[in-house]
Structures are given as structure tokens and as C-alpha cells.
A protein has these predicted regions:
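Short helix-coil boundary/hinge micro-motifs
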Residues: 1-107
């Protein structure tokens, strides 16, 4: 089965000719018939700006499973789960939030 290709230190992975932002399964919030995302750690790292811009403009992400560090934050990418279409991308303070709208490709 073909899977995305990422690089250590990059917040993106290549899939079907696109460089897509990778988001972490640990920040997913299931609801009644919905799946939302809330990453509470947006900060000053210069990687955030192009990462958020890519989610907003492409409206597509790769959901990943990660090893968590002692602080509960994603530390190392373990696998790719799926690509998703997303909408309602918002950044408020240190929170990045959006809604998953459609599962596009499966990798697990």
C-alpha cells in the first residue's frame, strides 16, 4: 500500500504530488457524528505560519499517529492514518482548531 513520505523535522508529508500538513491524532476530539481538531500549542516557532496557511488554503491534512513525550505532546511520528478534507480553520491564542469533513485516503 502506498503511503505519504515525510522528512524528519518537517510538519508536512508528500502525497499524490502534494505537500500536505500533518496533524496529530492526539488532538482529535470526536463529537456526535463529527470529528474536530484542537491543538493547544500554537507558538512562536516560525514553522507555524506556513503550516496554518497550508491548512487554510488547501483544506486538506494528513492525520498521523505519534509517540507522545513525557509532557503529553507529540514527539515522533509513528504512522500515517488518513488524509482528510477540513473546514473552519481557526487560530485563537495558542489554539489551532478545525473540523474534519471527509476522509479521503486510508493508510491503516
Amino acid at each position: 500500500m502506498a503511503k505519504p513520505v515525510g522528512r524528519r523535522g518537517s510538519w508536512f508529508a508528500d502525497w499524490k504530488g502534494e505537500s500536505l500538513p500533518c496533524v496529530h491524532e492526539c488532538w482529535c476530539r470526536p463529537g456526535k457524528g463529527t470529528l474536530s481538531y484542537l491543538d493547544p500549542h500554537v507558538g512562536d516557532d516560525p514553522k507555524w505560519s506556513p503550516f496554518i496557511a497550508a491548512i487554510r488554503s488547501g483544506e486538506k491534512v494528513i492525520l498521523t499517529r505519534d509517540e507522545l513525550g513525557a509532557d503529553g505532546q507529540p514527539f515522533r511520528r509513528l504512522s500515517y492514518i488518513a488524509t482528510y478534507g477540513v473546514k473552519d480553520v481557526q487560530v485563537e491564542g495558542t489554539n489551532l482548531a478545525f473540523q474534519f469533513v471527509e476522509r479521503l485516503d486510508n493508510f491503516t
